[in-house]
């Protein structure tokens, strides 16, 4: 049976703990799993959403406004709306983080649409991916 809360996008996994419907749009919370040597997503900023990253295991590298932060288990990083950022795992083990975004404008529907656009035969249509990002308030940098 398929886990409705798990969304696979390329090599990364999103497992929703609270989605936009459960919180009436107040927030979303999910586990974000990134395999070694993976970079996701493209540099962007959120027009209307703040993000908090809490390291669960491994080390997530997040570049925020040009400065690299290494987020290990138990460490936290706040990403205010409007700040350009990207996530990657530059290390040899899988990284897992708890992500909370408020308000819950970038939720399950966004990630399901991204999965449909990314998980295709051949190369994804980058312009289509950017259009989905913009629709949900993520602005490619």
Regions found by a protein language model. Give the residues of each.
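Hydrophobic small-molecule pocket/channel-lining residues, especially in calycin-type beta-barrels
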Residues: 46, 60, 86, 109, ...
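Short beta-strand His + acidic residue motifs that chelate non-heme Fe in jelly-roll/DSBH
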Residues: 42, 62-63, 79, 85-91, ...
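A short glycine-rich, His/Asp/Glu-containing loop-to-beta-strand
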Residues: 7-43, 49-50
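Short, conserved beta-strand element in jelly-roll/cupin
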Residues: 31-35, 45-63, 101-102
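Double-stranded beta-helix
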Residues: 93-141
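Short acidic-glycine-tyrosine-enriched beta hairpin
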Residues: 66-82
């Amino acid at each position: 049976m398929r886990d409705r809360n798990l969304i696979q996008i390329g090599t990364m996994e999103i497992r929703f703990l609270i989605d936009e419907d459960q919180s009436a749009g107040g927030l979303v919370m999910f586990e974000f799993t990134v395999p070694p040597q993976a970079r996701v997503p493209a540099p962007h900023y959120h027009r209307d959403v703040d993000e908090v990253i809490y390291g669960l295991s491994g080390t997530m590298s997040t570049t925020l406004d040009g400065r690299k932060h290494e987020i290990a288990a138990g460490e936290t990083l706040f990403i205010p709306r409007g700040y350009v950022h990207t996530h990657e795992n530059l290390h040899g083990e899988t990284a897992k983080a708890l992500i909370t975004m408020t308000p819950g404008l970038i939720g399950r529907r966004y990630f399901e649409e991204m999965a449909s656009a990314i998980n295709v035969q051949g190369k994804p249509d980058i312009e289509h991916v950017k259009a989905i990002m913009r629709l949900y308030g993520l602005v490619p940098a």
